[in-house]
Amino acid sequence: MGLHDGHRGAPVADLPQRAVGGTLVFLVIMGGIFYGGWLWAAVATAIGLGSLWEFYGLLDSKQRVSRWFGMGAGAILLGAATLKLEASAYLSVIVFIAFLVLFSEVIKRQVTGNSAALLNMGGTLAGLVYVTLPWAFMILLRSRESGKLFLLAIFLCTWSCDVAAYFTGKRFGRTLLS
């Protein structure tokens, strides 16, 4: 009957693939956390920018966002965290990107007569706040005295809850996961 036989608790065909992928991500993140420094900054930046790209892709299916302005600002925010810049640097980047997006929408309105300035700015800034800032703060957190311990606790708790939710939903969920 395909990959899933429809019974509760039935094995999932992609579970081995999920396990391998999850193990690789686990090793990369744990390696970054344990070694810290530039390695952790590189891991967090890569994951943060990849997540931001995906967020903008999901949002772009509903509304237009300034993906490249957002990605540039995300890279700057993550770089500021790597260099341990003051909080004013983060605020400056966010305000500047809001200005750039609004300015580009004003130009677009003048040229095409069509614009969704507030939706575009809101979506672009949402990606920075919801996706990029947490990764920037994790870069900063790792540089603190007990940062390694805090990050380990955050990731291990998140992963164990995620795995438990997956198997609970698989076994008892109303809509079976395939």
Where are these regions (language model features)?
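Membrane-embedded alpha-helical bundles of polytopic integral membrane proteins
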Residues: 2-178
